[in-house]
C-alpha cells in the first residue's frame, strides 16, 4: 500500500525498537487502553505470532514508512466487530514528522484497504477534545464528528471528554 512517499507494511522483527518506543511512551497510554509498558519479549512475540490479518487477529497493525524506508509511525485497526463490520482506528506519527501529511496519507491508505479489500462498513475513532491536531486530521480525512462523550478517558486523577468520529463506507 503506497501513496506518494508514504507506504504501509506489516511489522518486521527489525521494527522491535521503534514499536517499543511508541508503545512504551507513557504520554500515549492515556489515549488508549494500555496500563503499562510492553516488554521486549512481549513485543517480539507479537511481531512473530501476528498473522497481520484483521479476521484472524481481531486487529491490524501496520508500520507507516517514508523517507528511505524509515518508520514514521504506526496505524492500527482494532476493536474489530465482525458482525457489524466496524473497527476503531488509532494512529501515531513521530513528532518530527507531524504536520507534514504523513498521518493523512497513512489514514487514506488504511481506509482504502479496510473498505475495499476487507469490506468494512465503518471506521471510527475516539479523540480527546483537547487534541486539536488529531481532530483536524480525522475531519480532513472525511470523518464526521458524531458527538462528545463526557469523562470518557482518565488522565491522572481526572477525566476528559472525547470526540467520537465516524467514517462510513458508502459502498
Predicted regions and their residues:
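A short helix-loop-beta-strand connector motif used in the catalytic cores of GNAT acetyltransferases and
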Residues: 50-63
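Acyl-donor (CoA/ACP) binding surface of acyl/acetyltransferases
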Residues: 1-16, 25, 66-171
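Short, hydrophobic secondary-structure boundary micro-motifs
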Residues: 30-32, 59, 162
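Conserved catalytic core of Hanks-type protein kinase domains
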Residues: 21-22
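A generic secondary-structure signal
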Residues: 49-50, 113
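An acidic, carboxylate-rich microenvironment
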Residues: 15-18, 42
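Conserved GNAT-fold acetyl-CoA-binding loop/helix
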Residues: 27-49
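Sparse recognition of residues in long alpha-helices and their boundaries
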Residues: 35-36, 59, 67, 154
Amino acid at each position: 500500500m503506497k501513496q506518494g512517499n508514504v507506504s504501509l507494511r506489516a511489522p518486521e522483527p527489525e521494527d522491535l525498537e521503534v514499536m517499543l518506543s511508541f508503545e512504551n511512551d507513557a504520554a500515549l497510554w492515556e489515549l488508549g487502553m494500555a496500563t503499562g509498558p510492553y516488554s521486549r519479549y512481549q513485543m517480539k512475540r507479537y511481531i512473530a505470532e501476528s498473522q497481520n490479518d484483521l479476521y484472524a487477529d481481531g486487529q491490524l497493525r501496520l508500520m507507516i514508512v517514508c523517507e528511505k524506508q524509515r518508520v514514521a509511525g504506526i496505524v492500527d485497526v482494532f476493536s474489530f466487530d465482525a458482525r457489524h463490520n466496524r473497527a476503531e482506528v488509532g494512529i501515531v506519527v513521530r513528532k518530527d514528522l507531524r504536520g507534514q501529511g504523513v498521518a493523512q496519507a497513512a489514514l487514506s491508505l488504511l481506509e482504502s484497504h479496510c473498505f475495499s479489500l476487507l469490506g468494512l462498513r465503518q471506521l471510527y475513532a475516539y479523540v480527546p477534545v483537547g487534541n486539536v491536531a488529531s481532530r483536524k486530521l480525522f475531519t480532513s480525512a472525511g470523518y464526521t464528528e458524531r458527538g462528545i462523550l463526557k469523562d470518557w478517558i482518565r488522565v491522572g486523577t481526572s477525566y476528559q471528554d472525547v470526540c467520537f468520529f465516524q467514517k462510513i463506507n458508502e459502498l
